[in-house]
From Swiss-Prot:
Effect upon mutating D89S: Leads to increased oxidoreductase activity
Phylogenetic classification of the source organism: Eukaryota, Fungi, Dikarya, Ascomycota, Saccharomycotina
GO biological process, one term: cellular response to oxidative stress
Record localization: Cytoplasm; Nucleus
Superkingdom: Eukaryota
Gene3D superfamilies xref list: Glutaredoxin (3.40.30.10)
Species for this entry: Saccharomyces cerevisiae (strain ATCC 204508 / S288c) (Baker's yeast)
Annotated InterPro entries: GLR_AS, Glutaredoxin, Glutaredoxin_euk/vir, Glutaredoxin_subgr, Thioredoxin-like_sf
Keyword list, A-Z: Cytoplasm, Disulfide bond, Electron transport, Glutathionylation, Isopeptide bond, Nucleus, Oxidoreductase, Redox-active center, Transferase, Transport, Ubl conjugation
PANTHER family named among the record's database cross-references: GLUTAREDOXIN 2, GLUTAREDOXIN-1-RELATED
Residues annotated as domain Glutaredoxin: 7-110
Name of the protein described by the UniProt record: Glutaredoxin-1
């Protein structure tokens, strides 16, 4: 079971960053999501907090905290302006409908 302190820490990270992505270095869906953000949509890396959970001592706890917060067990686990987007499939669906660009507009305007 994940501690309330870890849950609060993860919630703070989500709130403090315009875009938050929990990822794993070996995950092809994570690579696709990050490629969409950085390469296709040209989101500056300074606007995105990417946590590579498999490279972090507390990675499993962070992933467990995200599950407690939003019910998603898998990575990538993406937030934009504090709103839970979901995973790569959700990100790509939002891109296809044009909603992703709308969500990113205030971030890219700064």
């Amino acid at each position: 079971m994940v501690s309330q302190e870890t849950i609060k820490h993860v919630k703070d990270l989500i709130a403090e960053n315009e875009i938050f992505v929990a990822s794993k270095t070996y995950c092809p869906y994570c690579h696709a999501a990050l490629n969409t953000l950085f390469e296709k949509l040209k989101v500056p890396r300074s606007k995105v907090l990417v946590l590579q959970l498999n490279d972090m001592k507390e990675g499993a706890d962070i992933q467990a905290a995200l599950y407690e917060i939003n019910g998603q067990r898998t990575v990538p686990n993406i937030y934009i302006n504090g709103k839970h987007i979901g995973g790569n499939d959700d990100l790509q669906e939002l891109r296809e409908t044009g909603e992703l660009e709308e969500l990113l507009e205030p971030i890219l305007a700064n």
